[in-house]
Amino acid sequence: MNFPWALPADLSLIWWLDHAGHEADLITDHDLHAEGLACLAPCKAVRNGSHPGYHPEETMGATEAYLGQSGRIMYLGGNGYCWVTGTREGEPHCIEVGKLDSGSRVWQAEPGEGYLASTGQKSGLWHNRGRAPQNIVGLGFTAEGMDESQPFEHMPDSFHKRVAWIFDGLGDKDPIGDFGLAAGGAGGIGLDRYELGLGTPPHTLLVASTSDQSDNYPLVGEEVTGAFPGRGSTQDAQVRGDLIYFTTPQNGACRAAGSIAGSQALP
């Protein structure tokens, strides 16, 4: 792996904000967990980091409440809101995650580790508990790969007048992010997709998608129900990153681009 990850990747975003002259405050996961909706309520808009994968119920609930009360979120990361996460009361610096019986994981929970000691909740994926990430930001984890990133390409919804502002300065056929520090493009490393069956709001506009990922990007294991070939990007249309936009009640909105590489492809 020859590119930054997590905090070093997020520093690219902070540099870009400063370089572009945008004023922004930094809110940590600890802040959001301790203060809930009150932490986000004063914000005109909120932007995630590049890999917001570990969230307890409290921070997910605060994010949903913010969107439902005229909040505006830019989810520009990948593999977000993925793993059930617990914290010990009085010890916010310590989190607990149990990687249970599905999901992309580098270790497997042992017998007796199916429930978090810190909260008593069942561990594993939020997806398996009926709270797939698509229910919050419209996108959810679909693939990961480490070879090459690709640009996003326009989809038919990109020509809708409601999203013209997203493509200001781009031609109708211009690729979106055919450059970047994370494997050469804006779409890669970890990809999230639009999926109505998992909770993407039905009025969501699917404005752009990645294509041409290699077969080193397989479909995530939690969605593979049979052991047969054809689960790589060149054969499975679910293996892609999507860029979407949807509105919420009281004039809220979410613009989401499902890619960990995205924050390292800002001009």
Residue ranges: model-predicted function:
Residues 19-25, 41-45, 68-73, 202-203, ...:
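Loop/turn elements at helix/coil->beta-strand transitions in domains of secreted/extracellular proteins
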Residues 91-94, 98-267:
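Glycine-rich, aromatic-lined ligand/substrate-binding cores of catalytic
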Residues 27, 48-49, 76-77, 209, ...:
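Generic beta-strand/beta-sheet core signal
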Residues 40-86:
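Short alpha-beta junction capping motif
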